[in-house]
């Protein structure tokens, strides 16, 4: 791979993780598939903070092309895969502590000043607050009636003007909590529905989607399937390949 191509892909990846992609997501995903192992892209961790729990990606399974994982008759839950910007929100003893962009899954940008206007300040059950640290993960989404809704949502997280962020038509939909509370993921989603919009309690047809997520419901089984460095094996995203997607980037010519 020549250096110009590597530099271009590095730029694409950096912009992708910042939520301001310079090429369509589907094209970026295909480029990554075709160049895996050819080069390593580093990320500047300055001004970024570590997630208490990694925010893994999902294995992509393309309909008609790939074979889905075999979960050995374990109960599996299907939910829509919303197309927005992934975030994490941390609560300490039930009180909002901070919020971050997904970033590269290990490190994200602090967006506490914005998310505190969307996420609840406390998570209490009666007079009891959750003890210890809980990391809630979810998606910031915008209505699909907005042009380039994903970029609209992701771009909002990079705004310096909090008042402008508050004026944007954005919704937080959550789909995860760590450490786990109950024995089943569906059980925890029902609990989180006391405070949040959760992925299991609506069809969310007003928001853009880019597939369907399937995951093993019982946490012990989910963990038994293990993880790769990229994704949990107990879940995957079923997607449809868009027509006209570029399948391989061969070279880059720079305008001079």
Q: Model-predicted segments: where are they?
A:
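RNA/tRNA-interacting regions in translation and RNA-turnover enzymes
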Residues: 1-256
